[in-house]
């Protein structure tokens, strides 16, 4: 990996399975680390809420903080109407966060570095919001394509532009998340490879610099989960307001 920083993003088969309708459904390293991320996510939540103490311990306090954090994002962008959608938004946030943080660990695989994964997440969010929009507002949901006060002669152009902008939302969401995770991990690998090749790994400055980069990557992992969630809430506000 030190020689090729992009090698860490390669998907390889762990268990080969029979094809399903002509499609490969092999169990890959991506599948493995996605399962690990989900298991860690579920354990974190279950262990945090199993006692439900009035005076919470550290783990329960952490779970409550994450939950309250997501609720505050929803309320600030959608108001009280968006609170009924907490299950989806909280699940998306904690899943992305878990995948991102697992990807920082040595010899792991960053699931969210692949557009196919982030695009699948984005399409779930996009489809859900579109369904909610028509369910809550009916045909009036289409008003998001034409801002109030738009001159009639300009309306056709604006509608086309707004429709295009709406349809590319899942693409922009998925590429933003994947690109940032790829960039961060690649930089760490490049610098770490340089330090190892120069045989200066155990000298203080380069070692501390790599530690700082890893700390920064943890920050980016949390930040990207936050950005994905807040954009989801912004898009949801169009459907419920």
Curated annotation (Swiss-Prot):
PROSITE patterns, A to Z: ATPASE_A (PS00449)
Subcellular location: Cell membrane
GO molecular function per UniProt: proton-transporting ATP synthase activity, rotational mechanism
Keyword Acetylation found: no
SUPFAM superfamilies attached to this UniProt entry: F1F0 ATP synthase subunit A
Listed GO CC annotations: plasma membrane; proton-transporting ATP synthase complex
UniProt keywords, alphabetically: ATP synthesis, Cell membrane, CF(0), Hydrogen ion transport, Ion transport, Membrane, Transmembrane, Transmembrane helix, Transport
Database matches in CDD domains: ATP-synt_Fo_a_6
Membrane topology field: Multi-pass membrane protein
Superkingdom classification of source: Bacteria
Chief localisation class: membrane
Pfam family, one: ATP-synt_A
Membrane-spanning residues: 29-49, 54-74, 86-106, 114-134, 153-173, 177-197, 200-220, 221-241
Recorded family membership: Belongs to the ATPase A chain family.
PANTHER family: ATP SYNTHASE SUBUNIT A
Subunit structure: F-type ATPases have 2 components, CF(1) - the catalytic core - and CF(0) - the membrane proton channel. CF(1) has five subunits: alpha(3), beta(3), gamma(1), delta(1), epsilon(1). CF(0) has three main subunits: a(1), b(2) and c(9-12). The alpha and beta chains form an alternating ring which encloses part of the gamma chain. CF(1) is attached to CF(0) by a central stalk formed by the gamma and epsilon chains, while a peripheral stalk is formed by the delta and b chains.
Known role: Key component of the proton channel; it plays a direct role in the translocation of protons across the membrane.
Protein name: ATP synthase subunit a
Native species: Wolbachia pipientis subsp. Culex pipiens (strain wPip)
Name of the gene this protein is made from: atpB
């Amino acid at each position: 990996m030190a020689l090729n920083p992009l090698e860490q993003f390669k998907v390889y088969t762990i268990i080969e399975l029979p094809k399903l309708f002509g499609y490969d459904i092999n169990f890959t390293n991506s599948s493995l680390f996605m399962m690990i991320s989900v298991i860690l996510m579920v354990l974190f939540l279950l262990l945090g809420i199993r006692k439900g103490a009035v005076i919470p311990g550290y783990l329960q306090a952490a779970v409550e903080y994450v939950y309250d954090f997501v609720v505050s994002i929803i309320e600030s962008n959608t108001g009280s109407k968006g609170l009924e959608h907490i299950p989806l938004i909280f699940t998306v946030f904690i899943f992305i966060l878990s995948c991102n943080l697992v990807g920082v660990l040595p010899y792991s695989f960053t699931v969210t570095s692949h557009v196919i994964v982030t695009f699948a997440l984005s399409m779930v969010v996009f489809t859900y919001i579109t369904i909610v929009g028509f369910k809550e507002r009916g045909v009036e949901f289409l008003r998001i394509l034409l801002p109030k006060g738009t001159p009639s002669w300009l309306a056709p152009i604006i509608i086309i532009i707004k429709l295009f902008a709406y349809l590319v939302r899942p693409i922009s969401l998925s590429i933003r998340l994947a690109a940032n995770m790829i960039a961060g991990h690649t930089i760490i690998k490049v610098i770490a490879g340089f330090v190892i090749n120069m045989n200066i790994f155990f000298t203080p400055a380069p070692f501390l610099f790599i530690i700082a980069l890893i700390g920064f990557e943890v920050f980016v992992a949390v930040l990207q989960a936050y950005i994905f969630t807040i954009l989801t809430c912004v898009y949801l506000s169009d459907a419920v307001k």
